[in-house]
C-alpha cells in the first residue's frame, strides 16, 4: 500500500548523504556483498562504510598496496571474499610490476597475485566475475587512442591474463561505458 506516492516520487529525486570519503591520491571503490560494505581505497588506506551498522571507518594498511590504482578497478572474489585490485597495463611493459593484489581485511594485509600485463589500458571497461569457471572477465574500454572489442579473462587460480576467443555469431563491436549482465538460465553474458 502506498500512502503518499507524491512524497515517494519527490524523495527519489534527492540523495541523503550518509558518509563522505576523499583521497589526495588515486582511489577506487567497490561493494563487498559478503560483508555488506562499501569500500573506498587508495594505496595507503581503506575507507569502509557498513550498510548494516551505518558506521564508517578508515583503516591504514600495515604496508602500502603493491598495485598503483591508476583506474581504481577492483572486484571482490566470492571464493575467498577478498578485495582484488587490478591494473594489468604497465606503461613501459615491465612485467615485474605488481598488476593484481588481494587485500585481506581480517589481517589488514596485501598479497601480490600477478604481474601479468595486457597490451593497452582499458578505461571504462565492463567486467564480470565468472564464479563457475573461476575467471574474471573484462570487455570494452579504450586506451592508446583505440576502442577495445575483445574479451580478456584472468584465471583466478594462477592469475594469468589471456585474450578470449569467442564462438562464431554476431560481431561484437569495440565499445566503452558498457555493462555486462549474466543470465544463469542461458549461461550467457549480455
For the regions a protein language model found, what residue spans apply to each?
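Kelch-like beta-propeller repeat domains
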Residues: 2-190
Amino acid at each position: 500500500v502506498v500512502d503518499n506516492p507524491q512524497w515517494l516520487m519527490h524523495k527519489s529525486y534527492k540523495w541523503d548523504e550518509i558518509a563522505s570519503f576523499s583521497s589526495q591520491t588515486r582511489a577506487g571503490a567497490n561493494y563487498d556483498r559478503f560483508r555488506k560494505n562499501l569500500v573506498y581505497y587508495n594505496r595507503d588506506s581503506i575507507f569502509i562504510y557498513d550498510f548494516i551498522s551505518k558506521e564508517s571507518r578508515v583503516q591504514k594498511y600495515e604496508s602500502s598496496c603493491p598495485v598503483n590504482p591508476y583506474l581504481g578497478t577492483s572486484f571482490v572474489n566470492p571464493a575467498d571474499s577478498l578485495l582484488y585490485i587490478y591494473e594489468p597495463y604497465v606503461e613501459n611493459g615491465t612485467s615485474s610490476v605488481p598488476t593484481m593484489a588481494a587485500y585481506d581485511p581480517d589481517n589488514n594485509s596485501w598479497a601480490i597475485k600477478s604481474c601479468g600485463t595486457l597490451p593497452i589500458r582499458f578505461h571504462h571497461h565492463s567486467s564480470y566475475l565468472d564464479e563457475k569457471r573461476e575467471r574474471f572477465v573484462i570487455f570494452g574500454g579504450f586506451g592508446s587512442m583505440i576502442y577495445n572489442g575483445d574479451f580478456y579473462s584472468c584465471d583466478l587460480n594462477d592469475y594469468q591474463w589471456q585474450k578470449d576467443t569467442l564462438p562464431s555469431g554476431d560481431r561484437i563491436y569495440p565499445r566503452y561505458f558498457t555493462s555486462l549482465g549474466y543470465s544463469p538460465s542461458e549461461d550467457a553474458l549480455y
